[in-house]
Amino acid sequence: IISIGLLQAAIVATGLGPRLTEIILNISDGSLIVTALLAVVAATLLGMGMPTPIAYLMLAMFAAPAIITAGAPVLGTHLFLFYFAIKSGSTPPVALVAVVAAGIARANWWSTSVAAFVHSLPGFIVAFMFLYSGALLMQGDAIFIVMAALTASVGVFAMAAGIQGWCVDW
């Protein structure tokens, strides 16, 4: 809690906070996908040294306005940012969660962190779908919610099967 207060005070005092949204929107030229990718980079950087709740709060203060301005729904934006604040612990370059797991298993930390990243790839795609489909967040008509859930499930299954090398002989 103390670190977020200090970091927020430093960002607000320097004027970087309000400008960060402007900088992200200028780089992305208002494109939702580019804005979201820049937010993923920010989430990864913040997740390297901060606990997940603090990283999410920083993203919510400074990256969420840019994503919402680019056209994403508010609920989808915050779920997207929270998801990537969590995922930053299992993806390289730091992959703190994977490194700890490798230490417990007495395995190679780099191969464990790469495996963690590869196995979480379907989740990265689903997180981007939160920004484009409110149906995945149970918003909208029931038929669209069911169709979105089915197509997302099939997509995640297909990616997971492809990553694992299953279903090759179909």
Predicted regions and their residues:
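Alpha-helical transmembrane segments of polytopic integral membrane proteins
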Residues: 4-7, 13, 17, 60, ...
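Hydrophobic alpha-helical segments embedded in the membrane of multi-pass proteins
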Residues: 33-41, 58-62, 76-79, 149-158
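Alpha-helical transmembrane segments of multi-pass membrane proteins
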Residues: 32-46, 71-87, 111-122, 136
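Juxtamembrane and boundary regions of transmembrane helices in multi-pass small-molecule transporters
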Residues: 83-169
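Membrane-interface helix termini and inter-helical loops of multi-pass transporters
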Residues: 11-27, 134-144
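Hydrophobic transmembrane alpha-helices that form the pore/transport pathway of multi-pass ion
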Residues: 52-85, 94-111
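Membrane-helix interface "capping/anchor" motifs
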Residues: 45-55, 164-170
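Core transmembrane alpha-helical segments of multi-pass membrane transporters/permeases
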Residues: 1-16, 32, 36-45, 49
